[in-house]
Amino acid sequence: MLLSALSLLLSPLVSASSAADYYVRSLPGAPEGPFLKMHAGHIEVDPDTNGNLFFWHFQNRHIANRQRTVIWLNGGPGCSSMDGAFMEVGPYRLQDDHTLKYNEGRWDEFANLLFVDNPVGTGFSYANTNSYLHELDEMAAHFVIFLEKFFELFPEYANDDLYIAGESYAGQHIPYIAKAIQDRNKGITENGGTKWPLKGLLIGNGWISPADQYPSYFKFIEREGLAKPGTSLHHNINALNEVCLSKLETPGAKNKLDVGACELVLQQFLDLTTEDHQCYNMYDVRLKDEAKSCGMNWPPDLKNIEPYLQRPDVVKALNINPAKKSGWTECAGMVHMAFTAKNSIPSVHLLPGLIESGINVLLFSGDKDLICNHIGTETLIHNMDWKGGTGFETSPGVWAPRHDWSFEGEPAGIYQSARNLTYVLFYNSSHMVPFDNPRQSRDMLDRFMKVDIASIGGQPSDSRIDGEKLPQTAVGGQANSTAAEQNEKERLKQTEMHAYTKSGEAVLIIVIIGVIAWGFFIWRSRRTRRGYKGVSNNDMSDSTSVLSRFQNKHSGRDVEAGDFDEAELDQLHSPSIEREDYAVGEASDDDDHIISHPETGGNRQSS
């Protein structure tokens, strides 16, 4: 025990001090191909309590018109962001407990991707067990300290457009962190320094407004046909819902993050519908789970993540501080119990100010999630006031339309947007949208960040709003690696050679035209030497130089392309030069239609 305590006290002295110390040189089980550039390890945020946050950073595969960084957070509170890294938006998915494969919907395509186990004590992060956090503002303060030190280590990312994304209880974390960043930036403006360009927030199936979302449990259960009217189940759940609604009307209840009477609605539904030791999966009601778990064993990939992240070679590869002795767990029960947030107001109260300050916000929901269901998200939007309107009101009594979204020919969901807030509903999707719809969720991210891949190329995805094709976003190719750099050099060399060839062909055509024009001029000058009357009745034969004749011609008007007869130009066309050799581009049929863009504190600390 004494040695363990001593190692924790000494850990800041032996912690990494430069970016090179965080470099991930290899990753057990990684697929063949160019190795991704990544860094991982701990950053100290509170020396008094040995508070350290673990991060894992992936460099983007491509840069499209500007540098971007996306921070991803899972919820709980107390659930590791390695869930997001290995089951949702990271570059890899686990095939088994020792083999990785590429994720087809990876979010590091056009953005640097930063996963953080937050708050301290979560996942690979650690702190003294008697110093776990209790409030949202404490968590946000730690996170700003983390970012200060991260950007000191990696200053090349400090000016990236910054986005914060996550799901479930991260719906509380993200707005609080955004507000803390804004407060920090204001201080930087006054005292000098680099502001972090925070551009947007993305929250999936978020726990944001308990007062709006608790009543949605019964509404969702009814709408999905999980409790038929007239049955005892329906009667019992409705009675519990009435108690919840009554409790929410008591003074101060709407500013609480956890209302016990409302938690009972979900808990009793799961208990009363348990049959043959099987209950509904509260994260995907299309599925069942063993009794008492009710979704805690889901997704199926989960069984591979813990063994993989507890492997000694993986722990070493990720530069885990030896002072972290307990090993990785998905959700830390002690962190969850400590994080009561009794003195914190729900993050929904922060969203209007963030939006009005110019930050774009995107809320997205999978339609089969119960615990943070889409009805609750739609209700909180409907009741929220921001930028001079209520909900998706575009003018008094007029609401922004819902647009049908299709992806590669299949219905994907619905888009709705007004005044810097966008809502996306994903069809056939769970609490973890990117797990079910990896490529569609990446398409959503790219559009929200306004990614422009016009200069990159690649095979675009077919994404449409109300049948109208959206700008291209998807692209393939090598990652940022040695092989990628070599391929890029080769591509530039070929481009230069192609340009040189084209320029040579262009010069040849000009020379041919010049020779013919010169010969024609000589022939005409011999015939008209006796005195040709020009249009202005001037005798052109008196001109003594070729230059003066060109000057006389130029004094009229500029020569336009339309002055030439196409038939004459065709006569100059060399049969050895094909049209595609000197074509400079083709018309694009892309249109200009652009859509800009909890893991509750209840029974389970979810992903």
UniProtKB/Swiss-Prot annotation:
Locations listed in the record: Golgi apparatus, trans-Golgi network membrane
Signal peptide as annotated in the record: 1-19
Ranges annotated as spanning the membrane: 503-523
Domain of life where this protein originates: Eukaryota
Similarity-based family: Belongs to the peptidase S10 family.
Molecular-function annotations in GO: serine-type carboxypeptidase activity
Keywords, in A-Z order: Apoptosis, Carboxypeptidase, Glycoprotein, Golgi apparatus, Hydrolase, Membrane, Protease, Signal, Transmembrane, Transmembrane helix
Protein name as annotated: Pheromone-processing carboxypeptidase kex1
Gene: kex1
